[in-house]
Amino acid sequence: MPSLYLTLLRFMKNNRLLPSIQLAVTLMGLSLPLWGDVPVTVTINTAAPGAKIADDFAGLSYETTRELPDQGKYYFSAQNAPLIKIFQTLGIKNLRVGGNFVDSPRKAIPTEPDIDEFFGFAAAADTKVIYSFRLNHGDPAASAAQAKHISDKYSSSLICYSIGNEPDIYVHSYKGWLKEWQPIYDAINQVVPDAKFCGPSLTSNAQPWAHDFVRDFYPSGKVVYVVQHQYAGGAGGKITDPVAGRDLLLSPGWHDIYQKYYDKFVPPLKAANIPYRLEEANNFYNGGAKDVSDTFASAMWGVDYLYWWADHGSQGINFHNGDEVAAGQIIAPCRYASFTSAPDGYFVHPLSYGIKLFNLGAHGQLVGSTVAPDDAAKDLNLVSYAVLDADKTLYVTLINKEHDANGRNAEVTIHTGSASYAQGQTIALTAPGGDVSAKQGLLLGGDSIHDDGAWQEKWTDLGASISAGDIHVKVPACSVLLVKVTTK
């Protein structure tokens, strides 16, 4: 009998025959826990709108070497139709090139023809650029010449210039950094008087430099925003147990990591109304963690990460991307990639699905969204974000990070606070079988994003699930649901 008990215990989880199984077990005189859906109340407060989400909030970051041709063929090219389509489908409006290799003397600096191909792509994809120049053993005159070329020909696609990448790794003081950085900055300004910049592009270990940078350069009016980097999970190679790694990636404790980093460099910027952006970020550095960064866990993490930083006033995040990335001065597999090259275009990794879902709902200003699970499930790993558009359309994103054998579904009641919300739609992001380790077969609105960038947008009407401003939806474990409601 004990073996039957255990067999039924394993089988009943997430099974549509659960009520019948429970009855049969009861008749046998056994007592099994019944995993029901957890009631959750989400209360929206639109009275005090918060940060407005920038149109180019979700961006990508690449190594500068990606501008170079590979056997005569360019990755970034106006002729690369699948890549252009991927950018358009995901809604990528901010493209940064830099990374470790921008400061590697062993790597070639892009030439003007390389730059022309790159900006041809940017125009075709309708994305704007943060363009980086070499700082480590940099050449002020060469950087200035390239800046003039870019500004003369491609100013409509340019956001700003950045000089160097994570200089705190090889220059160990702000004073030492300034000695190398300012000659390049001055040389560019001499030939491009209206040039705009961002900086200082540091790791998460050197936040005070950001304040020094603001003091010395922001008053000039030439700084678009302060930019920093973050890989909240640390080195990907240290994650040796994928199950534990996915648990870590989805842990509520990661919000504490973000908050700690925020507290170290953002408050003085916020007080002075100085914008900031995470110019390079992802979950684990050195290319990510195997069987963690490349799974559905990263999709849920990505949605949450984007919204957390948007809610804390960031102007955006550029997820580092590529087929391979620089781990220090070596090349490593890019496990945290948003997408990688495939025979017919680009294989879209789970993180891209998170980016796409975010862009479907990130229209307007963030408003209050309070999650209150049932008293018996206070530890439910579900987060909610709400955005109010100028036309009063309300978007509510529900991320149920519960997963694996003990993952709990959520029956959510959303109190919008206004009976005028009488109609709406939902779109769900799911993994096959609710498998948090899934790397393919993901669905957003019932369709996958294909290698050629094609995706069919399909929403589901709420119908009777909305009444008098209250919305009732189910959010299964290991899934994300975006709810969009409009007034009568």
Language-model regions: role of each:
Residues 8-23:
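Bacterial N-terminal signal peptides that target proteins for export
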Residues 31-33:
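N-terminal signal peptide c-region/cleavage motif recognized by signal peptidases
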Residues 37-221:
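N-terminal catalytic cores of secreted or lumenal carbohydrate-active enzymes
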Residues 60, 95, 166, 226, ...:
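Conserved, mostly hydrophobic/aromatic
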Residues 140-147, 174-305, 312:
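Noncatalytic carbohydrate-binding groove/subsite architecture in carbohydrate-active enzymes
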Residues 278, 282-384, 390:
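Aromatic/acidic polysaccharide-binding cleft in carbohydrate-active enzymes
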Residues 377-420, 426-435, 478-484:
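Carbohydrate-binding surface patches
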Residues 417-471, 475:
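Acidic, Ser/Thr/Pro-rich beta/coil linker or hinge segments at domain junctions
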